[in-house]
Amino acid sequence: MGNNREHKIQILLSEIFIFLQKKFNSHRGFVFLASRDNLIAVSNGISIKNHKLIINELEKQFPVTVSMGIGVGETPIKAQIEASKVLSAKGSAQSSRKKVLAYNGHKIPIIGEVKVAHVDINFYTKIATDIYPFYSNYINLNKGYTTLMEDFQKIGALCFFNGGDNFLSVCPNSMQPSELKSIFKSFELKHKPWKLKAGIGIGKNILEAISKANICLKEIREGNNQEKIMLKN
C-alpha cells in the first residue's frame, strides 16, 4: 500500500468488519470489534461448512487472507482462550501461514443457549454528553470499559464497548444476577457519579439473546431506571 497507507488500512479494516458482521448475522451470529485486525465472533449454531464459506467469500472480495480459530468452553472466556490456542498452534501471524480454520475436534455447530447482558449508564446524556467535551467523556468511557472488561472476565464473561454508553457482555449461562450486581457495585465506586443498569437476554443464538436483553433494558428505561437488572428467557 506504500508509505501513505494508514487511511487505506483503516478503510479496509472497516469494510472487512462490515462484511464479516453481515455474514455472521445471516447465520444468527455476531461479531465484536476487538483490536480492529482481530475480531471475536460468537458463532453458536454455525457449522464448520459455513465458517469456511465466510472465509472463502471474504478472500474473493478483499486482497487479504483470514484465519479463524473456533473455541468451545464452559464459559465465553474459556472458549475464547481455546480459539486463540488452536489458531496459534497453526502458526503465528508472522509465520508463513496464510489462512486456516482451526478447531479442537469438537462437534460443531455448538447448540445451546446464549446469555447476553446489555449494560448502559443511567442518564449518561444529562450527566456527561451535555456537560463535558467529547474527548474527556471518551477517556472516561474507556476507563469504565476497562473496569467492566476486567470484572466480567473474573466471572468468565467477555465484555465489549458497543457505542454511545452501551456495553455488551457475553456471559456464562450459569451467571446469576447477584454476580452482575457485584460488578455494578465495584464499577460505581470507581466511576462516580455513574450508575449502571442491564437487560439480560437468553436465546438459542446470540442475536435472539441480544434482542431480549434490549427489550429488558427498554423496560428499565421506561420505568425511569428504578430497576437495575432485568432478565428475559
Task: Describe these PLM feature segments.
Residues 1-233:
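Regulatory and interdomain segments flanking nucleotide-handling catalytic cores
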